[in-house]
UniProtKB/Swiss-Prot annotation:
Similarity section: Belongs to the HAM1 NTPase family.
Active site as annotated: D71
Residues involved in substrate binding: T9, R10, N11, S12, G13, K14, S72, F156, G157, Y158, D159, K178, H183, R184
Phylogenetic placement of the source organism: Bacteria, Bacillati, Bacillota, Bacilli, Lactobacillales
Manner of cofactor binding, per the entry note: Binds 1 Mg(2+) ion per subunit.
Catalytic activity: XTP + H2O = XMP + diphosphate + H(+); dITP + H2O = dIMP + diphosphate + H(+); ITP + H2O = IMP + diphosphate + H(+)
Subunit structure, as described in the record: Homodimer.
Cofactors named for this entry: Mg(2+)
Name the record gives this protein: dITP/XTP pyrophosphatase
Amino acid sequence: MEKTLIIATRNSGKTKEFKKLFADFGYEIKDLTDYPELSEIEETGTTFEENARLKAEQIAEITGQVVIGDDSGLCVDVLGGLPGIWSHRFSAPDPTDEKNIAKLLHELAPTAITPERRSAHFHTTLVAAKPGRESLVVEADWDGYIALAPKGENGFGYDPIFMVDAFRTAAELSEKEKNQVSHRGQALRKLMAELPEWLYK
């Protein structure tokens, strides 16, 4: 069985989560930092699946390897699903996690006294690609609310403002807790249920 998978990302936080989640399955995980000669794949899609496919399928063609493309984002209901596929670039032109969070909290300021209007979910689409093979696609969501201010030291991205229950943000969960319930953890378990058969059908 092929035991090396390339994750189509240079995001160290994302790679760390994948390594942790795949460890139980005995896979070696590489990411695009292991392939510095590969140019950046532009995310020109209009959906999570289109972007995940672009990354996975293009890099699979170039490397000849099995590649997992991940496109994830935070979708806030009152903002019509934004930041969505633009989550990582929400505070462009020079986005950082801190600036993305600050912009989102600013956009949600009018809803501060109505927490029920701050409902949101994280979404992940994973695409497994291999040359000459129809890609495998799985998706998952993680429901929650947007906090009034960042809390917690763990995780990355919008985790410090994503309330997973009445008391804690995603950044206050341990790695193990987060991986059991998160959008990426759920999607990965779906992927692992189908990946072995897909690799060899």
